[in-house]
Design a protein with these regions (language model features):
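Secretory/extracellular carbohydrate-interaction modules
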Residues: 9-79
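Flexible glycan-contacting loops in extracellular carbohydrate-active proteins
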Residues: 125-148
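Extracellular beta-strand elements of beta-rich domains used
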Residues: 107, 147-151
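Low-complexity, Ser/Thr/Pro/Gly-rich disordered linker/stalk regions
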Residues: 1-29, 33, 113, 159-171
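Short tryptophan-centered beta-strand motifs in secreted/extracellular beta-sheet-rich domains
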Residues: 28-30, 100-110, 114-116
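Short, aromatic/His-centered strand-loop micro-motif at the edge of beta-sheets
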Residues: 83-104
């Protein structure tokens, strides 16, 4: 709109996208001017290229998979097929390019034929069927100008596009009929008015749940049951000026009495409150900064807080805290259930933003997967990934952003799956740290693992990307083979698993500005769309109904806490019910792993 030209590179390296993922046979053209002979990095997927590449992107499957017709430096025109970090040349011609004027680039996509023109003259027309449809746009990794960009389609292509959209909508509507839809069940009173956040907590019996409610100003926490009945309230000192960034409180049964206790940081102190009574059990000041992080002599920049079974049951849980900044952390402090110091460990390289805990060797004590280092309960380093003994190429690729650990293949062998920033997705042997697979999909950041595909053995790992290429989702089997890849939007890095039907296949809870908000199947289809309240709520899925392992939905909005459930019962004749065992190591949102389990239907 308006007058041009526009300098896309004022924003840095960019891919400007329009249309939708269903477009096939279109013509895209624009006048492009190459200004300078150096590029701008970091790049979405051209970081390893010194060349200046500016032009047209066609059939964009995601922001790292598309065709790219471009002016390259000042001496050639090239058509690339972009596949993550690979750029496959499909056509190229050497021709002088004039930096003082705009050149007309045109790409005509018809079936598997890609006809490319420069200044009205055909330069090559390769055949390639890798990408059959997708968005279209403008791509720039150097200072360039674009004028008169347009996309056209003939009548046949337009009618074909409408037919595909209509068929897709009918198929999706039919698919949605197979799934229960959410219906409002009841409202749960809040312990006190005003904004706040909710954390589920266990009370006594395995299926008895309540919640902690934290006031928006961080100065008050209440414990209540799911009827809204207040159990107790504690007043906190509130954040200190030098406190680290706010972190979620933890609900964990530290003392083993059946009630999840309250563990949090308040006014530069770690505090533990009894889940049964709300009484303060222990507190201690945060440690001073450890080596290589923070300011010496000042409070450590604490980022993470966990309760871990480092000693065999029935011993109480231990507490660990970790420092962190935007690039991860280096120090781990361990305390017992009375917050008495046990050990401190400086790790050899930075960990990321989510840890995992599992009894790897079968001795009844959990090991701690801190980034790419496995520690035992005494703080000993058992192994570290060989990959982390050098800095992988890329601006942000030297730590594990998030990890999951478990029997991913369903054969009893424990595996690590790690989203490792610019190094992509890694699969490793949890007993030795040997890397088994690597897949570079961009800056891999978010991860969950669950039975997303009913007929696949084990559980499936869903990885999502972030910096420089937001929103690509890749689903793997437990061995690390790709099962599906899609891009719901350009902001998300993952969702979380939801056991909605108890039939052995979990759905993905996702709030997407482009694809909608609700529950998606493993092929990226929105099969359970949310209504208005659920769309704007913080939604917490959890099995809350006795005898029904399906997740219900707690919807927290500024106005109320609402409980939503399925609009139909479990079908008659479904005698075995899927009831996965989940671990939420960081609150209940990040790095979730959902282990398969089946239970008999109650009589």
């Amino acid at each position: 709109e308006g007058e041009g030209p526009y300098l896309l590179s004022k924003l840095g390296d960019r891919l400007l996208i329009a249309g939708d993922r269903h477009w096939r046979d279109v013509t895209i053209r624009a006048r492009v001017r190459q200004f300078f002979s150096w590029n701008i990095s970091p790049s979405v997927n051209l970081s390893y290229r010194d060349a200046c590449l500016n032009g047209l992107a066609c059939r964009i499957r995601d922001v790292r998979s598309y065709y790219f017709l471009c002016l390259e430096d000042f001496d050639r025109v090239t058509l690339y097929r972009i596949e993550d970090d690979e750029q496959i040349v499909l056509g190229q011609v050497f021709v002088p390019l004039d930096r003082t004027r705009f050149h007309l680039l045109e790409a005509r996509c018809r079936g598997d034929r890609l006809t490319c023109l420069l200044d009205g003259r055909e330069v090559f027309a390769p055949v390639d069927a890798t990408y059959s449809s997708g968005w279209f746009g403008l791509r720039s990794n150097a200072k360039a100008g674009f004028l008169d960009a347009e996309v056209t389609a003939d009548e046949e292509a337009w009618q074909g596009h409408l037919a595909r959209l209509g068929a897709g909508e009918r198929q999706l509507a039919s698919l949605r009929e197979q799934y229960p839809q959410p219906v409002f069940q009841r409202q749960i009173p809040r312990p006190f008015e005003g904004p706040g956040s909710l954390q589920l907590r266990r009370v006594e019996a395995e299926d008895a749940w309540g919640f902690f409610w934290t006031a928006g100003d961080g100065r008050r926490v209440a414990a209540a049951d799911l009827e809204g009945q207040l159990r107790w309230t504690v007043d906190l000192e509130g954040p200190a000026p030098e406190d680290p960034a706010p972190i979620s409180l933890k609900a964990a049964d530290v003392d083993g009495d059946g009630h999840d206790d309250l563990l949090l940081i308040d006014h530069n102190k770690v505090k533990l409150f009894s889940g049964r009574t709300g009484e303060l059990v222990a507190e201690r000041p945060l440690p001073l900064s450890g080596p290589l992080m923070g300011v010496p002599g000042r409070t450590a920049p604490i980022g993470y807080l966990y309760a871990v079974r480092f000693r065999p049951a029935p011993a109480p849980l231990d507490i660990i805290i970790l420092d962190a900044d935007a690039g991860g952390g280096r120090n781990v402090w361990c305390y017992d259930h009375q917050l008495r110091p046990r050990w401190h460990r400086l790790l050899p390289f930075a960990f990321g933003h989510n840890m995992h805990f599992l009894d790897v060797d079968g001795d009844g004590r959990d090991e701690a997967m801190i980034g790419h280092c496995l520690l035992n309960g005494d703080g000993d380093l058992l192994w570290s990934l060989e990959e982390m003994h050098y800095a992988p190429h890329g601006a942000m690729g030297i730590h594990a952003d998030s990890v999951v650990l478990g029997d991913l293949e369903g054969n009893g062998a424990l595996r690590l799956a790690s989203v490792s920033g610019d190094d992509g997705v890694l699969f490793a042997d949890a007993a030795t740290g040997e890397i088994l697979r690597r897949d570079r999909i961009g800056h891999a950041q978010g991860i969950t693992a669950a039975r997303y595909v009913r007929d696949e053995p084990g559980i499936q790992v869903l990885a999502g990307t972030r910096h420089r290429a937001y929103g690509i989702f890749v689903l793997y089997n437990g061995k690390g083979d790709r099962l599906h890849r899609w891009q719901p939007d350009f902001v998300n890095q993952n969702g979380r698993p939801v056991n909605w039907t108890a039939d052995g296949e979990e759905l993905l809870l996702l709030s997407s500005p482009d694809s909608g908000t609700g529950l998606f199947d493993w092929r990226g289809r929105l099969v359970v769309p949310f209504g208005e309240e659920l769309r704007r709520a913080t939604v917490i899925p959890h099995p809350l109904a006795a005898g029904d392992p399906r997740d219900q939905l707690l919807a927290v909005t500024p106005e109320r806490i609402a409980l939503y459930t399925q609009d139909r019962p479990i079908p008659a004749g479904q005698e075995q019910l899927f009831s996965p065992v989940r671990h939420y190591w960081r609150g209940n949102t990040i790095g979730v792993i959902s282990h398969p389990r089946w239970v008999a239907r109650p009589a």
